Amino acid sequence: PEEVLLAKQIIKHHRWASMAKFTRGGGEANALAIRIARSNTKNKNVAFCGYHGWHDWYLSANINSKKNLDQHLMSGLNYDGIPKNLKNTSFPFPYNDFEYLEKLIHKRNIGIIKMEVMRNLKPENNFLKKVRKICNDKKIILIFDECTSGYRENMGGIHLKFKIFPDMAIFGKALGSGYAINAIIGKRKIMKKAENTFI
């Protein structure tokens, strides 16, 4: 019952969402979100911005170049143990560089965009609005990783302050006040696909 109560409370804070799932850690939540998103689209490639954990989908970006993740919080991450066939499935893009992202979407057939709403930089030149629009236009699933930013400055995700709403969002850290809990929320039509895969 506590899980249901918490899910209802988080959804109450995020009216655009209608379903929630829970994990223990942020890396697990990120991997789960990617799996659910990929089950919703034929275009499995991911464009991302920011730090999103240690799972294969994320670290595979460094197969092309060990410097790919250098601008995403942690540099010099080794991809040993990551299957080489994951090469060219996840691609980083710089925050606030919409032109770069737009080219990446066309070049790499991107089906999912996963990003931190903000970390040490604020969005400029309607960056978040442009990202949301291109996701709408290209039928790309937009995931906001709010493990770090959620429930710190406001009651919910920091994306609420900008009035830009994703298809899925992830929360952790402040959500549990020190306890190991993360939440993935999303639109019903997307989250329902979790029932068709093993989670």
Regions of interest found by a model, annotated:
Residues 1-199:
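Conserved N-terminal phosphate-binding loop of PLP-dependent enzymes in the Aspartate aminotransferase
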